[in-house]
Design a protein with these regions (language model features):
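Non-heme Fe(II) oxygenase catalytic core, chiefly the N-lobe of the double-stranded beta-helix
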Residues: 1-233
């Protein structure tokens, strides 16, 4: 097995692991690497949808998107399709996927089928480092606080893409989560807020909440917390 770091903050390209192998032993290797590097990238993995589902099941219960229809045969798989003339980018702002759900999602598995000749890169940011480097003043303000996450940030994308079909639901879903979470496997503290879905910190007045969130959002975007991945097919 070969590990190539994407950046100093997070991310590793992994060679020598076959994602078609959905055995518990293979999953444990992947999970251990994920806990260490936060984001993993595998090249030339021509897996089927069924094999993707089999791998995903090891991480926990599968989820469906609340606004966009999944595939008919595999409804947990959401197709992200952008036609050449469409200008908006799916997930174009910094976010934590579906953080408005009642329980934080452990893993998102993305598989590239067809990619543009230029552009389309995805960036990831390490929220463990983001918390560690947060000022003591902000830490003291948010360590014991919860924040509201709203799905309306995702609803804005519904029907924006002609190849992606909404399921007819535009209701708002919201849940509160700790601003600072302790990862259940590593025991490390991480920031669990994001500019797309987090709307307000509870038990703070609206202005103070807005000021603190905006400061955190800017902090999260520091390039030295990030890695950038250029997709290729499979």
């Amino acid at each position: 097995m070969e590990i190539k770091l994407i950046s100093g903050a997070l991310g590793a390209e992994v060679n020598g692991i076959d994602l078609k192998d959905s055995s518990l032993e293979n999953w444990k290797k992947i999970n251990n690497l994920l806990l260490e590097h936060k984001a993993l990238f595998f090249r030339d993995q021509d897996i089927t949808s069924e094999e993707q589902i089999n791998l995903a099941k090891h991480f926990g219960p599968l989820e469906r998107h609340i606004y966009v229809k999944g595939r008919k045969d595999y409804p947990e798989i959401l197709r992200i399709i952008k036609a050449p003339e469409e200008k908006r980018q799916w997930g174009e702002t910094w976010h934590t996927d579906v953080s408005y759900n009642p329980k934080p999602t452990k893993v998102i598995i993305l598989r590239s089928i067809k990619v543009p000749p230029v552009g389309g890169d995805t960036m990831f940011s390490n929220m463990e480092i983001a918390y560690d480097t947060l000022s003591d003043k902000i830490k003291d303000k948010v360590n014991d606080k919860r924040a509201i996450h709203s799905s309306l940030g995702a609803a804005a994308f519904v029907d924006a893409y002609k190849e992606m079909e909404g399921n007819g639901n535009l209701d708002e879903y919201s849940n509160s989560h700790p601003v600072v979470r302790t990862h259940p496997e590593t025991g490390k503290k991480i920031l669990y807020v994001n500019s797309m879905y987090t709307k307000r910190i509870l038990d703070l007045d609206e202005n103070e909440s807005s000021d603190i969130l905006n400061e955190i959002f800017l902090h999260q975007e520091r390039l030295d917390f990030t890695c950038r991945f250029k997709w290729t097919e499979n």
